[in-house]
Swiss-Prot record:
Protein name: Large ribosomal subunit protein bL33
SUPFAM superfamilies tied to this protein: Zn-binding ribosomal proteins
Domain of life, source organism: Bacteria
Record's keyword terms, sorted: Ribonucleoprotein, Ribosomal protein
PANTHER family xrefs: 50S RIBOSOMAL PROTEIN L33, CHLOROPLASTIC (PTHR43168), LARGE RIBOSOMAL SUBUNIT PROTEIN BL33C (PTHR43168:SF2)
Molecular function terms from GO: structural constituent of ribosome
GO cellular component: cytoplasm; ribonucleoprotein complex; ribosome
Lineage per the UniProt record: Bacteria, Pseudomonadati, Spirochaetota, Spirochaetia, Spirochaetales
Single GO BP term: translation
InterPro entries xrefs: Ribosomal_bL33, Ribosomal_bL33_CS, Ribosomal_bL33_sf, Ribosomal_zn-bd
Organism, scientific name: Treponema pallidum (strain Nichols)
Length: 56
């Protein structure tokens, strides 16, 4: 079996339309809190806060 690494894949979910527009990775050892970024949402056509969500 593969070893579990500290880097995990996450999705960034729009707080306005609740869609998952972006995927990225983060290191669990370096970043303890949930990731929040202002990114462009093509469905709302503006920059909106995106929060970290698990990839299903």
């Amino acid at each position: 079996m593969a070893k579990r690494t500290a880097v995990e894949l996450i999705a960034l979910q729009c707080t306005g339309c609740k869609r998952r527009n972006y995927t990225t990775s983060r290191n669990r050892r370096n970043v303890q809190e949930k990731l929040e970024l202002r990114k462009y949402c093509p469905f709302e056509r503006r920059r909106v806060l995106h929060r970290e969500a698990k990839i299903k």
